[in-house]
Regions:
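Bacterial N-terminal signal peptides
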Residues: 8-19
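Bilobed "Venus flytrap"/periplasmic-binding protein-like clamshell domains
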Residues: 31-55, 123-190, 307
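N-terminal (or domain-start) structured segment
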Residues: 27-91
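Pocket-lining segment of extracytoplasmic ligand-binding domains
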Residues: 90, 133, 169-274
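Pocket-flanking alpha-helical
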Residues: 63-107, 185-187, 204-211
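A structural signal for short loop-to-beta-strand junctions that line the ligand-binding cleft
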Residues: 106-120, 125, 247-255
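Extracytoplasmic
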Residues: 29, 41, 57-59, 69-72, ...
Length: 365
């Protein structure tokens, strides 16, 4: 009887501890969300890369959510449950900071608790017109019918800000259309609008996946370096180039344009579990950065693993900042300590390879 009772108790304890262990394992996996951008934009691909190459190795199940863009992302990061990360354009973030500084209480409530993880890459600003348009340069868009992107998108912020900087006035209400990127291009082709402003990192899936026949009906406007409007736009935006190599079956030459920086943003969390998960995310980001650059969207090749100084009203998230700085320092120390590897040609008896050795794959043996 005693043996039977002890066996039963042992079974109960085993069941209890196995259940507890299983529950502990489940609890260790964090289920977070990141808000990105439109379905065919660059942001959503960057979010997918972070989920695969950074969050997953850190034990975080990161769901990648589409959105209208940066302004909506700020709001969702601030108020939507489960959203722990967001991709945000620098001009949108700065607009919130400026409005808060000017006394807008709602802007202050929204932006003050947000913190940066790190800057990412520059996003090109495309000014798209029909191929038969008489316009050649960006400073010619005054008084034209323009789609500036969806309300809540970073594109809308960039488009309206650039117009105001260049021409000293807002776009007239009757000339503004708030269309998605796809709808804007469709409206452009059927002549319902004159210009579509689109913000996306090159190569943008929106254009690379576009029907080749439709693609031949549109082109990009260029920055005129000598136009007075260009000098005024430089107050906020930076010169950039849309490379023909990004769209080799379409563009015949590079196109000068403007750019805006993308940032990875979080909230000033202080709950122990969340802080711990985001620390692991930071460690994984540093450790797997090479995978992002080699396996992710081409824009990752432009990202530098560094934390530059920030302007007033901008702050890094301290727990992540500490981990990233420590990891960056370790990487730098390792690179300094490692001797420079000889080139393939120098590996053959310390002399350059001959043409014959190269042909026979004898270099580097």
């Amino acid at each position: 009887m005693l043996k039977t009772t002890l066996a039963a108790l042992a079974g109960l304890f085993a069941l209890f501890f196995s259940t507890f262990a299983a529950g502990g394992t489940a609890a260790a996996d964090a289920h977070y969300k990141i808000v990105t951008g439109q379905e065919r934009g660059t942001y959503i691909q960057i979010g997918q890369d972070l989920a695969k190459w950074v969050a997953q190795p850190a034990g975080i199940d990161l769901t990648v959510l589409p959105s209208k863009g940066s302004a909506e992302n700020v709001q969702r990061l601030r108020f939507e449950p489960g959203v722990k990360l967001a991709l945000v354009q620098s001009d949108v973030y700065q607009a919130y900071v400026d409005m808060a500084k000017a006394g807008n209480e709602e802007a202050g409530t929204t932006i003050r608790p947000l913190r940066l993880i790190m800057p990412l890459y520059d996003e090109e600003i495309y000014f798209v017109v029909r191929n038969d348009s008489p316009m050649k340069t960006i400073n010619e868009i005054k008084d034209k019918v323009i789609s500036v992107g969806l309300i809540g998108s970073g594109t809308a912020q960039s488009g309206t800000t650039l117009y105001r900087l260049m021409f000293g006035q807002p776009i007239p209400d009757q000339n503004v259309q708030n269309l998605s990127n796809e709808d804007a291009l469709a409206a452009l082709i059927v002549k319902k609008i004159d210009v579509a402003i689109i913000v996306a990192g090159q190569p943008a899936k929106l254009f690379t996946d576009m029907n080749p026949e439709l693609l031949q009906q549109i082109r990009f406007l260029r920055v005129d370096p000598n136009a007075p409007e260009t000098a005024r736009a430089k107050q906020t935006y930076f010169p950039a180039t849309i490379h023909a190599s990004s769209y080799p079956n379409w563009l015949k030459e590079d196109v000068p344009t403007w750019t805006v920086k993308a940032f990875l943003v979080t909230y000033d969390y202080n709950l122990r579990d969340t802080v711990g998960n985001l620390k692991r995310f930071a460690d994984s980001l540093c450790q797997n950065f090479n995978n992002l650059q080699s396996q992710g969207h081409p824009k990752w090749k432009q990202v530098k693993l560094e934390l530059p100084g920030l302007g007033k009203g901008w702050q890094y998230y301290p727990p992540v900042e500490q981990r990233l700085k420590a990891c960056i320092a370790r990487r730098a120390a390792m690179q300094t300590a490692m001797p420079q590897a000889p080139t393939a040609e120098q590996k053959v008896t310390g002399r350059p390879c001959t043409d014959q050795e190269r042909l026979l794959l004898l270099c580097g043996k």
